[in-house]
């Protein structure tokens, strides 16, 4: 299988060294080897010094899989946002790439590769997973950082303010605001205040919550009680404010 290459094992920042770990890439077993969970990348090498290495930004998911129906042994499951293939598969893929793009212009699905790391000691899965989490956190998704920078608030320039170069908004008190109204505006404001005053004075609240006028008259033999709403009726309701 030509996806394996020779490279020196990582020496710095190794959080977890797991010998006797079988690698299964895309359903094909590669035999036992050593898994290196390092801060820079995730690497696996067999006894001949051949293996593969993954960069953390390319890893979209890692988890402990205990579902023996999906795979007969418990393992560390890793999903990669690329297609790991041998040399023959890569050449065939490159030959058909243009034809596939012309036929499937609307297909935006990203190729993925499923990798399973099966340790000899299943009790080590928890520490393997924790080491993966720690190393993955050192390589945040750059798209998340870009989304955080999409909105930037206006900066307050202290130096410009001291030099009088900043337009400071003008605020008025209620009385000062009235003095800036035109005659027509003052008349409109007075009319609105009168309407609001009349509306409050004639307020009648239905559903038995509160009334300031006479109680409702019975109609068609039905008794309408002008009482408080039953306490606790909506205590469990989650209201968005």
From Swiss-Prot:
The keyword Nucleus applies. Coiled coil: none annotated. Pfam families: Voldacs. One of its GO terms (cellular component) is spliceosomal complex. Residues 88-112 are annotated as: Disordered. It is found in: Cytoplasm, Cytosol; Nucleus; Cytoplasm, Cytoskeleton. Keywords: Cytoplasm, Cytoskeleton, mRNA processing, mRNA splicing, Nucleus. GO terms for biological process: cell volume homeostasis; chloride transport; mRNA cis splicing, via spliceosome; spliceosomal snRNP assembly. It comes from the Eukaryota. Residues 97-112 have a biased composition (Acidic residues). InterPro entries: ICln (IPR003521), ICln/Lot5/Saf5 (IPR039924), PH-like_dom_sf (IPR011993). The keyword Cytoplasm applies. Belongs to the pICln (TC 1.A.47) family. Component of the methylosome, a 20S complex containing at least clns1a/picln, prmt5/skb1 and wdr77/mep50; may mediate snrpd1 and snrpd3 methylation. Forms a 6S pICln-Sm complex composed of clns1a/picln, snrpd1, snrpd2, snrpe, snrpf and snrpg; ring-like structure where clns1a/pICln mimics additional Sm proteins and which is unable to assemble into the core snRNP. Involved in both the assembly of spliceosomal snRNPs and the methylation of Sm proteins. Chaperone that regulates the assembly of spliceosomal U1, U2, U4 and U5 small nuclear ribonucleoproteins (snRNPs), the building blocks of the spliceosome, and thereby plays an important role in the splicing of cellular pre-mRNAs. Most spliceosomal snRNPs contain a common set of Sm proteins SNRPB, SNRPD1, SNRPD2, SNRPD3, SNRPE, SNRPF and SNRPG that assemble in a heptameric protein ring on the Sm site of the small nuclear RNA to form the core snRNP (Sm core). This is Methylosome subunit pICln. It comes from Xenopus laevis (African clawed frog).
């Amino acid at each position: 299988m030509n996806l394996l290459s020779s490279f020196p094992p990582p020496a710095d920042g190794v959080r977890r060294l797991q010998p006797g770990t079988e690698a299964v890439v895309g359903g094909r077993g590669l035999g036992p080897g050593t898994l290196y969970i390092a801060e820079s990348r995730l690497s696996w090498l067999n006894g001949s010094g051949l293996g593969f290495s993954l960069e953390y930004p390319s890893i979209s998911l890692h988890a402990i899989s205990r579902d023996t129906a999906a795979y007969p042994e418990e393992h560390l499951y890793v999903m990669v946002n690329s297609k790991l293939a041998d040399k023959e598969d890569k050449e065939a893929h490159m030959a058909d790439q243009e034809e596939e793009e012309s036929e499937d212009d609307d297909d935006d699905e990203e190729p993925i590769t499923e990798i399973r790391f099966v340790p000899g000691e299943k009790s080590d899965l928890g520490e393997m997973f924790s080491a993966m989490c720690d190393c993955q956190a050192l390589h945040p998704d750059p798209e998340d950082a870009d989304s955080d920078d999409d909105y930037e608030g206006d900066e307050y320039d202290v130096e410009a303010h001291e030099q009088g170069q900043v337009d400071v908004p003008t605020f008025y008190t209620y009385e000062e605001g009235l003095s800036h109204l035109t005659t027509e505006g003052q008349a409109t404001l007075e009319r609105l205040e009168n309407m609001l005053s009349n509306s409050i004075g004639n307020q009648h609240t239905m559903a038995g919550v509160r009334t300031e006028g006479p109680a409702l008259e019975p109609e068609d033999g039905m008794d309408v009680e002008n009482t408080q709403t039953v306490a606790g009726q909506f205590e469990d309701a989650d209201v968005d404010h």
